[in-house]
Amino acid sequence: MNQLTNLSSAEISAQHEQDAKDLTRILPASKKVYIEGSRPDIQVPMREISLTDTPTGLGGEHNPPIMVYDTSGVYTDPNVQIDLNKGLPSVRQKWIEERNDTDVLSGLTSKFGQERLKDIRTADIRFAHIQNPRRAKAGKNVTQMHYAKQGIITPEMEYIAIRENQRQHEAVDMRQHPGQNFGAKNLKEITPEFVRQEVAEGRAIIPANINHPELEPMIIGRNFLVKINANIGNSALGSSIDEEVAKMTWATRWGADTIMDLSTGKNIHETREWIIRNSPVPIGTVPIYQALEKVDGVAENLTWEIFKDTLIEQAEQGVDYFTIHAGVLLRYVPLTANRLTGIVSRGGSIMAQWCLAHHEENFLYTHFDEICEIMKAYDVSFSLGDGLRPGCIQDANDEAQFSELKTLGELTHRAWERDVQVMIEGPGHVPMHMIKENMDLQLEVCKEAPFYTLGPLTTDIAPGYDHITSAIGAAMIGWYGTAMLCYVTPKEHLGLPNKKDVKDGIITYKIAAHAADLAKGHPGAQARDNALSKARFEFRWDDQFNLSLDPDTARSMHDETLPKEAHKSAHFCSMCGPKFCSMKITQNVRDYANNLTNSDSEVEEGLKAMKEVYQEQGQKLYHKV
C-alpha cells in the first residue's frame, strides 16, 4: 500500500510483514470453524479452543473443545489469502442483491466524493478497487428494521442467531449462577425469530450498510451478549492510513465488535475507504468531524448542505452507523455554564458553538427527518450522540445531561416511524452510586433502544489508568442493561493510542462485558469460566493460557519465573511454590478423603461382624472369665 509516511520504503515493507504475521497468526490451540445455516452461503465464524485431557491421576477424563465468539474475520482463517489492497471477500452481496430493492449507481453522488476521485494528489493513497455504491430504489426502505417489521427474517438475522448461541448447547459444563438481569430476557437459545422481533421493536440494531457487504453481521441489544467498540482514527498530529488499518485489524483480532473511525487529520475520506473495505465488523463515524474539516475548522461556517453531502459521502462508502449530536439544543447550552468541565464532547461543543454563533436551533435537530431519509436509503443506523455528557464526576447526572437524553428519546421515536435503527450514546464520568439512574432513565425515555456508553469512568484521579477506572463503570452499566461499551485506552485524556494501547483497552473491556454477561445470567456465559477453572485446578497450564482472553500475556507472565517446558506440567506456580499451593493441597485433601472413604467401609464391615458376635453371645456386655 503506497501512502504518506516518514518511514523509508524498507521500513514500511518490514512493518507490513510484521503486521501481517501478527494479524494472521491464529491464537494457540485454536482453529477457525464455520457453522452453516439454512443455506450454504450462511457460514458463521467461530473460534474453537482445543483442550488437553485431565491427567490420569486426577481422573483422566476427556475435555471437549470450547467454542467462543470470534470477531477477527478471515484474517485468522489460514485458507484465505489476505490482500489489503483488494479488501475482504463479500459476505452479504448476494443477500442484498436477492432483495431486489436497491440500485447500483453510476458513480459517487456526493460532491466531495467526486472531488476526491478527481484530485490527482490523492491518487497514490486511494483504495484501488472502489465499487459503485448502492442506494435504495425510489420508494423503498432497505433497513433491517423495516424488514423485521414486515415479518421478514433476513439471512443477517439467521446469521446473528447462530453467532449469539456460540453452540453453547454442546458445552459439557453448563453450571451457572442465575444472575440478576433487571428485566432483560435470558433465552436458553437465540432464534432467528427472536432476533427479528427484537429489531422490529427497536430493542436491538443490526448495523449493516448495504455498501459494506464485507461485514459479518452482528447485533447490539441488551437481550444479547454485551458488545464492545474500539475507537481508532488519525489526528492532525500524526498517524497514517497504514497505521489506522493495522489498528482496525488488530482491534478485531482481540475482540472489538465494532470500530469507530474518529479521524480528524489528513485524508479522512481515503483512510475511511481503506478501513471499511478491510473491516469484518461494522464501522461507525462522527460525520460532523469531517464536515468541520471541510470548513477549515470554523464551526460557525458549517451548513446543513455541507453536512448532508458528508452523510451521503460516508453512506456511499459503507459506514454502518453515524454518531449525530441532534440532541444538543440551543436552550440546553446555558445549562452547562456552571459545570466544572463544561461541554467535553467534540461533537457537542461544535454544535453548541454553531447554535450560539447563529442563535438558531441545532440544524441536526431541525433537519432530523431529512437525515432519516438518507439513513434508510443505505441502512445506516443512528448512534444518537450525548453531546452534553459529563466530563467529570462532579457534573454527572445534571440537568443538561438528562435534558439531552429526553430529547434523544423523542428523536428515537421519530426515527422508528421511518424504520431507521437507533442506539443511544451515554456517559461519560459517573461515580458508581449514580450509574443505575442513567440506565433506568434511558430505558424509560428511549423505550429500550440499545444504550451505548463510554465507560462510564468512576473516578477522575487516574490518568494513565482510565481503562481501569472506566471498566469498573462499564461492567456495572453493562449489568444494568447497556448493550455496547465503548472502550477506553490507557492513553485516554493523554494522547493518541498505539497498537498496544488498543489491545489493552479491548482486553479490559472484554473483561467488563463478560462480567456483565455473567451478572445478568446470560445463558452459557459461564461455560468458558468453568473450563478455565477446571484447567487451573488440574494444573493444565497450557489450557489455562489458551482459554484466557489474552493467551500471549498469560503465558508470558507465567514464563517470567517458570520458563522451562517442564514447568507447564508442574503442580504449582511461582506465587506459592510447591509446598504452599492451595490447589495442590486441596487435591491432597481430596485424595485423603477418598482413602478415608475406603477405610470407613472397612470399619463398617468390622463393626457389623462384632455386632453379630455380640448377638451370638446373648447381647451381654460382660462375661465371666
From Swiss-Prot:
Coiled coil: none annotated. HAMAP family: ThiC. Binds 1 [4Fe-4S] cluster per subunit. The cluster is coordinated with 3 cysteines and an exchangeable S-adenosyl-L-methionine. Zn(2+) binds at residues 429, 493. Belongs to the ThiC family. Pathway: Cofactor biosynthesis; thiamine diphosphate biosynthesis. Signal peptide: none annotated. It comes from Acinetobacter baumannii (strain SDF). The gene is thiC. Keywords: 4Fe-4S, Iron, Iron-sulfur, Lyase, Metal-binding, S-adenosyl-L-methionine, Thiamine biosynthesis, Zinc. One of its GO terms (molecular function) is carbon-carbon lyase activity. Homodimer. GO terms for biological process: thiamine biosynthetic process; thiamine diphosphate biosynthetic process. Its cofactor is [4Fe-4S] cluster. Its EC number is 4.1.99.17. GO terms for cellular component: cytosol. This is Phosphomethylpyrimidine synthase. It holds the Pfam family ThiC-associated. [4Fe-4S] cluster binds at residues 573, 576, 581. Substrate binds at residues 231, 260, 289, 325, 345-347, 386-389, 425, 452. It catalyses: 5-amino-1-(5-phospho-beta-D-ribosyl)imidazole + S-adenosyl-L-methionine = 4-amino-2-methyl-5-(phosphooxymethyl)pyrimidine + CO + 5'-deoxyadenosine + formate + L-methionine + 3 H(+). Catalyzes the synthesis of the hydroxymethylpyrimidine phosphate (HMP-P) moiety of thiamine from aminoimidazole ribotide (AIR) in a radical S-adenosyl-L-methionine (SAM)-dependent reaction.
